[in-house]
């Protein structure tokens, strides 16, 4: 096999593996949401809030691509389940921000702990240099996914 064919096959394999990982990730998050009594979009929105911190419903809508009405219903569900609270914006008392609650972070973290531990075990199979290369590649792949997400939203 020539280097060109080998390279082409490796690239195809990368695409196939990312598709496989993406599918497994979606299915895992659906099961995790169900275990928490949430819808998958609710769980991912809670994750966005835990990662980015407090934001308005409009900002959450932009990040998720959900309509205003859908975000309102989603925040209602998350608030009722104890994952978020609505608070007045300390910088503008006319605005309301959605704040992730610390207890909910722990609850979600506990659910994901086995996956995190398995991922750390996997990392131990590689050298620091290999991990840096893997992280660079995966980080760039995540950037591509973000760009494609924005393209689809337009």
Curated annotation (Swiss-Prot):
GO molecular function: DNA binding; DNA-binding transcription factor activity
Superkingdom of the source species: Bacteria
Family annotation (SMART domains): HTH_MARR (SM00347)
Keyword terms, alphabetized: DNA-binding, Transcription, Transcription regulation
Positions of the HTH marR-type domain: 7-143
Keyword Amino-acid biosynthesis: no
SUPFAM superfamilies, A to Z: Winged helix' DNA-binding domain (SSF46785)
InterPro entries given in the database record: ArsR-like_HTH, HTH_MarR-typ, MarR/SlyA-like, WH-like_DNA-bd_sf, WH_DNA-bd_sf
Any one GO biological process: response to stress
One Pfam family per UniProt: MarR
DNA-binding span(s): 57-80
Protein name (database record): Uncharacterized HTH-type transcriptional regulator YcgE
Natural source organism: Bacillus subtilis (strain 168)
Origin organism lineage: Bacteria, Bacillati, Bacillota, Bacilli, Bacillales
């Amino acid at each position: 096999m020539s280097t060109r064919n080998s390279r082409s096959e490796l690239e195809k394999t990368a695409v196939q593996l990312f598709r496989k990982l993406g599918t497994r990730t979606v299915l895992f998050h659906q099961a995790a949401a169900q275990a928490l009594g949430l819808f998958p979009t609710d769980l991912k929105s809670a994750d966005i809030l835990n990662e980015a911190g407090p934001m308005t419903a409009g900002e959450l809508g932009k990040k998720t691509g959900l309509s205003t009405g859908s975000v309102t219903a989603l925040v209602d569900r998350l608030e009722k389940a104890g994952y978020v609270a609505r608070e007045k914006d300390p910088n503008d008392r006319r605005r309301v921000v959605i704040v992730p609650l610390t207890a909910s972070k722990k609850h979600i973290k506990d659910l994901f702990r086995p996956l995190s531990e398995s991922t750390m075990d996997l990392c131990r199979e590689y050298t620091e240099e290999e991990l840096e290369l893997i992280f660079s590649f995966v980080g760039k792949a995540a950037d591509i996914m973000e760009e494609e997400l924005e393209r689809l939203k337009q």
